[in-house]
Amino acid sequence: MDRSNPVKPALDYFSNRLVNYQISVKCSNQFKLEVCLLNAENKVVDNQAGTQGQLKVLGANLWWPYLMHEHPASLYSWEDGDCSHQSLGPLPACDLCDQLHLRSRQGGSVCGCDPCEQLLLLVSQLRAPGVDSAAAGRPV
């Protein structure tokens, strides 16, 4: 038996997650979009530019029912819209429809009947190209 390359525990396999996202924008296609994934401490876990992509969550802290895990309240959640920590410049009236699909690395669903893993997904910057948010009177 080769011990130089030990098998990793199941926790490592199940702790890494992928978030496939697609955001439909029903307005002009002249915009810049950056999607950020934040953890419970509002720290960026991963980010991507564009209306679709895949975010990686390494070492994801999954939600567990009370008394079923030593850290049961470690939740991620997602939101979009005009959040106080977003930097939004002047925008045309847009209708954003978020279609999020949480998948494990092998393509199995991690939502539904299983303990649901919610992720904090923020549309952190959405503005027309060439529009400076600071010049528009909004903090960057």
Swiss-Prot record:
SUPFAM superfamilies: beta-Galactosidase/glucuronidase domain (SSF49303). This is Putative inactive beta-glucuronidase-like protein SMA3. Coiled coil: none annotated. Disulfide bonds: none annotated. It comes from the Eukaryota. Ubiquitous. One of its GO terms (biological process) is skeletal system development. The gene is GUSBP1. InterPro entries: Beta-gal/glucu_dom_sf, Ig-like_fold. Belongs to the glycosyl hydrolase 2 family.
